[in-house]
């Protein structure tokens, strides 16, 4: 409106000037000519007819008409409702050279917005833009467990920065190389009773993993290889390939993780994956780089490292994960009998210093060729970071506590024991670890250990006597209903971590059992190497029939305890 009032005043001023010009046309004409030009002659006209318009007058009338149109246009704009139209950039301001007058019309043109206007978008397009704006303004749901730094957890990788990442692929490389010194000096360099350590007085590649995570358009997949000792030792602990054909142990021998799935943008995320994935029953990771110790206690070492099946990871909040499983069996590539296994994990992290984990397993028939024997197991852990002061030399401290209970019933055994169904077949154990970090996490010290009681030995790792596996069994260490087994261990671990991608680890372990179980100086390999069927006695030289008697049978050297030292280099990118 102010622009309109200003234009109205200018318009009145021009009218006054025009009136004066009409009253004295000769003066106006003289002003338009050069001062040296001769005076113009007046034109003849009828006495009552109007005088003819000069060129200057016609120009001024044209300018007045343009001004009237501009004023009308301004009035229509000021009275029209606001529309979501985009106005083109205003004309550049009129610049005048010093001493050169600026006409009123030019001033009005410069002051008014440009007449070039982009038409308003259709209502549908406007609505779409508004919807996109609303979606952009909507709060983004927090990523699960991203609210704090959980690299301190036992079983979690401590790397905080990815070495390399793309929109489609996040690579991962792991190397685990160790040297173990067994104080009993077994002559065949074989170590029994562990799912992490296998040879003595030798440098061995426990695992070389190459792979990573694929992720694009909500589709996900993961691959991790297991070259090295794991490719032999992990499959030999699974008896399910003995049922049926196609050599499942060989088919999966060189992969530790292999699955594909889809991510749903619901709640705080839902992942559906199928294939081989880590179980984390027993808290410790399958990969030693992620753990506080190299040799975990029995509660971890004797429980599943992987499952083959389908999992659904549901994140209702950024603090909670609920993960049901449908799997072939208890750390198995296939089924042992006619029934698969079912389980679930619940993980709750309310803040940055507390993690509560529960793994439950049920209904699987996991004893080979024994249908009707059903397994149940619960594995529950709590981890607390009770000290955190980065400015001190000892900058962090935390502990983990894990408790496990389980049993089997049916097929000649019972959970309680002392019944007509059979002897007690159960598992009870715990482990506790305390870790300290020093010098901004460059050094770590862990003390821990645990204890188990497993009558029936259904979760005891079978010693590799004469090449025995979970499929063959061995008469030298039976796993029959009612067979007793109690064990305990303690360890001390020192880590030097000059980079977040490497750990130099020194560890001492003492392990013991109530029955001869660990490899002694005589080893667990017959003279000259494995001899005959692994599930049978090995006869002494020159004897064709043997029954386990020392007079006719070769006997492995098994002891009730072991002491060993381990040095390992662990790498993860």
Predicted regions, residues:
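Bacterial N-terminal signal peptides that target proteins for export
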Residues: 2-13
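Bacterial N-terminal signal peptides
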Residues: 12-22
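Gram-negative outer-membrane beta-barrel domains
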Residues: 32, 47-51, 123, 128-133, ...
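Outer-membrane beta-barrel pore domains
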Residues: 234, 243-248, 354-364, 370-573
């Amino acid at each position: 409106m102010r622009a309109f009032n200003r234009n109205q005043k200018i318009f009145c001023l021009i009218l006054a000037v025009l009136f004066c010009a009409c009253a004295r046309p000769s003066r106006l004409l003289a002003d338009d000519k050069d001062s040296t030009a001769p005076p113009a002659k007046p034109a003849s006209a009828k006495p009552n007819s109007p005088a003819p318009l000069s060129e200057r007058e016609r120009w001024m009338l044209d300018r007045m008409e343009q001004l009237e149109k501009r004023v009308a246009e301004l009035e229509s704009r000021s009275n029209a409702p606001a529309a979501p139209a985009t106005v083109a950039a205003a004309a550049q301001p009129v610049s005048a050279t010093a001493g050169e007058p600026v006409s009123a019309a030019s001033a009005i043109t410069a002051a008014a917005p440009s007449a070039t206007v982009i038409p308003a978008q259709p209502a549908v397009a406007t609505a779409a833009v508004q919807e996109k704006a609303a979606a952009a303004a909507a709060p983004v749901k927090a990523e699960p467990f991203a609210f704090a730094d959980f690299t301190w957890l036992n079983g979690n990788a401590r790397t905080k920065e990815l070495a390399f990442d793309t929109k489609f692929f996040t690579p991962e490389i792991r190397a685990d190389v160790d040297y173990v010194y067994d104080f009993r000096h077994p002559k065949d360099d074989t170590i029994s009773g562990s799912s992490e350590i296998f040879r003595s007085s030798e440098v061995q590649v426990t695992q070389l993993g190459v792979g990573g995570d694929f992720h694009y358009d909500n589709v996900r997949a993961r691959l991790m290889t297991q070259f090295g000792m794991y490719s032999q030792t992990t499959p030999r602990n699974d008896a399910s390939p003995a049922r049926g054909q196609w050599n499942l142990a060989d088919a999966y021998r060189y992969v530790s993780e292999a699955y594909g799935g889809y991510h749903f943008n619901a709640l705080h995320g839902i992942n559906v994956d199928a294939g081989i994935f880590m179980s984390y029953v027993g808290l410790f990771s399958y990969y030693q780089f992620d753990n506080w110790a190299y040799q975990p206690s029995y509660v971890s070492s004797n429980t599943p490292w992987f499952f083959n099946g389908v999992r659904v990871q549901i994140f209702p909040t950024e603090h909670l994960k609920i993960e049901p499983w449908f799997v072939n069996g208890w750390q198995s590539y296939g089924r042992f009998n006619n029934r698969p296994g079912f389980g679930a994990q619940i993980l709750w992290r309310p803040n940055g210093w507390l993690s509560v984990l529960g793994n439950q397993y049920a209904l699987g028939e996991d004893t080979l060729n024994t249908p009707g024997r059903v397994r149940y197991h619960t594995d529950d852990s709590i981890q607390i970071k009770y000290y955190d002061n980065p400015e001190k030399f000892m900058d962090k401290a935390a502990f983990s506590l894990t408790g496990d209970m389980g049993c089997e019933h049916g097929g000649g055994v019972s959970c309680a024991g002392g019944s007509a169904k059979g002897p007690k077949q159960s598992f009870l154990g715990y482990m506790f670890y305390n870790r300290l970090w020093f010098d901004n996490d460059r050094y770590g010290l862990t003390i821990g250990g645990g204890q188990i009681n497993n009558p029936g030995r259904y979760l005891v790792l079978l010693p590799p006597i004469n090449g025995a596996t979970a499929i063959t069994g061995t008469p030298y260490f039976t796993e029959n209903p009612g067979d007793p087994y109690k064990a305990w261990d303690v360890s001390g671990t020192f880590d030097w971590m000059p980079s977040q991608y490497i750990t130099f680890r020194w560890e001492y372990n003492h392990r013991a059992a109530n029955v001869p179980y660990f490899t002694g100086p005589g080893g667990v390999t017959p003279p000259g190497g494995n001899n005959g069927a692994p599930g049978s006695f090995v006869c002494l030289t020159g004897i064709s029939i043997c029954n386990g008697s020392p007079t006719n049978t070769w006997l492995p050297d098994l002891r009730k305890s072991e002491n060993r030292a381990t040095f390992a280099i662990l790498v993860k990118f």
